[in-house]
Amino acid sequence: MEIETRPHISGDEKEEEQPLSPAARLFHAPEFNCNIISVIGFKSKLDPCVFIRGFKESFIRHPRFSSKLVTDENGQNQRWVRTNVVVEDHFIVPKIKPQNIENSNAFLEDYVSDLMKIPLDTSRPLWELHLLDLKTSDAENVAVLKIHHSVGDGMSIMSLVLACMRKTSNPDELPSLPYQYRSSSRSSLLTTGSRSDSRLLWLVKVIWTAVILGLNTVCDALEFIVTTLFVKDTETPIKGDFLSTKSKQLRLVHRTVSLDDIKLTKNAMNMTINDVVLGVTQAGLSRYLARRYGEEETKNRKQKKLPKRIRLRSALLVNLRPTTGIQDLADMMEKGSKCRWGNWFGYVVFPFSIALRDDPLEHLEIAQKTISRKKNSYGAMLTYIFCRIIVKLLGIKVAASIINRMVSNTTMTFSNMVGPVEEVSFYGHPITYFASSAYGHPHALTIHCQSYMNKMTITLIVDPTVISDPHRLCDDWEESLRSIKAAVTKRESLRLWDYLRILHNRVAWLLYQIAGLLYRML
């Protein structure tokens, strides 16, 4: 059965064809060919007919999911062309053998790994959904959604998926999504200064903030340039050989931890959740690398401890939309809205300080200090503008080569996304977790964190020839979170004890004064 999608075209998109944006063209370059993959766990059995009917009524109404990629004979001009969509062709329901059900977690990892090796069919819209009747340790059934990155970034894709979901507690209500405008430290400073300080002091603050912003932006721009030209990360056990990465098989693993533990740390340390996640990631990487270097020491019978000066940097993805959180599809597609569908993100080079520390809270403090400086900069916006200019002036091949070189000189990719705060259902099927990430870029390690309800899911995509034990890396991440939580709890206990001691001393002093007064009166 075919569905004609043209009647769903909005007034702003009556054109049958639309050219690819510079970012979308980059994602189709041979150096990248990036895809987004999301493993979704469900509480109940999946009904393929219900999903197909739901996709017909909602999902394919979006132009990008009812358009195919068309390339000219010379391969230079690429465009989206609206087409008829046979929804059933995009659904895959594999037959799973009984022996695979016994070790379902390993089978799911192998299935997703094989799926990441197969390119999407460009003769139809670039997405597909796999429905697996497979019970795993944390889900009754599993779905795997695969979408080409040229269709949109993670924020766009998630907004569309969530627009198709409903609250489990109220099937008629859309998920409650965080919707907060960015409030940088510099903007709050200027607002506060304009209200309470004199004009001269406020002017000094404005000038000082502008100077710091400019210096940080220049530093980030120079870091981008030198990284592209010659500055490479240390050859650690998690940095891959990117010349042959495309021929290697990737693996996706995930681990779910308590979001309440992260919030407890956030509140105690006066940080954001993103600060805590970066700090825990830094601690987990340090712990994992220390083990890997120790194993090599045992194997080679040579002293090879964790080096003191390791340059390990991440390409940290930054959402450039003027609002934070995941915007619902209606807001994102509304005419005049500041939120737009597509690939609207830049990235900054984020250095992780790799070391084993006696106080695990130092990892949080270092990460917060670094990311605070990165936030007070237009470095991410500059990378976005730079990519667009290079694509237009020098062509997609030169631009892809430059970006590929810059990314290859770093070690990993990191991203973080906020999810629904309550349980949601996908066409009537309650969801237990989202494990999403992207692949195709030249990194042996990609870490993506996504919150959902009171949980945080950490998803790793690794090159198994470089990181053969990704579950141990997940263990180190989780153990680092536990040690940081324990340190925070201990600090809070000591702080409470100090408060009680001060209170005790003051009460004792007060009683002494009262006793002295009574003695004199008598």
Curated annotation (Swiss-Prot):
InterPro entries: CAT-like_dom_sf, O-acyltransferase_WSD1-like, O-acyltransferase_WSD1_C, O-acyltransferase_WSD1_N. The active site is at 149 (proton acceptor). Glycans are attached at residues 270, 409. Residues 1-205 are cytoplasmic. Keywords: Acyltransferase, Cell membrane, Endoplasmic reticulum, Glycoprotein, Membrane, Stress response, Transferase, Transmembrane, Transmembrane helix. It catalyses: an acyl-CoA + a 1,2-diacyl-sn-glycerol = a triacyl-sn-glycerol + CoA; a long chain fatty alcohol + a fatty acyl-CoA = a wax ester + CoA. The keyword Membrane applies. GO terms for molecular function: diacylglycerol O-acyltransferase activity; long-chain-alcohol O-fatty-acyltransferase activity. This is Wax ester synthase/diacylglycerol acyltransferase 4. It comes from Arabidopsis thaliana (Mouse-ear cress).
